[in-house]
């Protein structure tokens, strides 16, 4: 039986391996550039916005919004992740901008008094047993005229990654989740399906971007040409 992933058991490892790496840095750079465009579209008057960071984990991205004066409701299933996030938020002097909510995203409506201007739902659906209703619930929290930033693990990218690594039998078997890879998502989502879910919820898709389209396929540097992280970021921006 597949269950929603709770990172209480490996929160510190998650923080180090996912965000404390070149891959994490590249992801944050590209995602932030996309968020800046979203903010310009939603916030022409430059007022403070109400933001929901649904399944926001360590709150790296939403802290950038808080620094701009926006108010953030940070929701996560993992209490350990929330505690780590609180420490970092407090260290950065942003605690007054935050409301921390220990809850699965599926129950977030119980914790919000009113809809929000912006929803961030990043890298959560691939860890859920049933992502579609969770996405629908999150989108229901967006007020008219607001916007949502949705990021998910691309099924096609997962197929390609396994093929490049020579895991062809695994692909032919349907890529069942391997429990020993605790930081590997339970599933990838097919973009065409997610786009339909979003549109069926009454939203117009205003932009799309690939995150780490190249860096995930760069192999062992010992056998490759010389390059720097900045070079990979420049490639991702193309």
Protein language model features and the residues they cover:
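A C-terminal cap/extension of S-adenosyl-L-methionine-dependent methyltransferases
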Residues: 207-238
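Class I SAM-dependent methyltransferase SAM/SAH-binding core
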Residues: 60-107
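A conserved beta-strand element that flanks and buttresses the S-adenosyl-L-methionine
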Residues: 120
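A short glycine-rich, Lys/Arg-flanked "PGG" loop and its adjoining helix->strand segment in the class I
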Residues: 132-147
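Conserved class I S-adenosyl-L-methionine
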Residues: 1-55, 60-64, 84, 88, 147-174, ...
């Amino acid at each position: 039986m597949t269950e929603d992933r709770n990172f209480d058991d490996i929160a510190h490892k998650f923080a180090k391996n996912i965000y404390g790496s070149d891959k994490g840095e590249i992801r944050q750079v590209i995602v932030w550039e996309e968020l800046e465009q979203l903010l310009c579209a939603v916030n022409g008057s430059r007022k403070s916005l109400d933001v929901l960071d649904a399944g926001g984990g360590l709150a790296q991205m939403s802290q950038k919004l808080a620094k701009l004066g926006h108010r953030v409701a940070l929701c996560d299933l993992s209490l350990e992740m929330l505690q780590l996030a609180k420490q970092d938020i407090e260290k950065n002097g942003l605690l007054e901008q935050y409301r921390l909510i220990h809850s699965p995203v599926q129950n977030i409506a119980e914790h919000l008094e009113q809809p929000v201007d912006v929803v961030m739902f990043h890298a959560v659906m691939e860890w859920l047993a049933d992502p579609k209703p969770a996405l629908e619930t999150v989108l229901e929290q967006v007020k008219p005229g607001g916007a949502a930033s949705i990021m998910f693990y691309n099924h096609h990218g997962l197929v390609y990654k396994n093929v490049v690594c020579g895991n062809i039998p695994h692909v032919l078997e349907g890529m069942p989740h391997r429990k020993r890879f605790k930081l590997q998502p339970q599933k990838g989502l097919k973009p065409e399906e997610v786009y339909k879910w979003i549109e069926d919820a009454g939203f117009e898709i205003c932009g799309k971007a690939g995150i780490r389209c190249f860096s995930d396929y760069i192999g062992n540097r010992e056998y490759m040409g010389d390059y720097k992280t900045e070079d990979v970021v420049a490639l991702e921006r193309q």
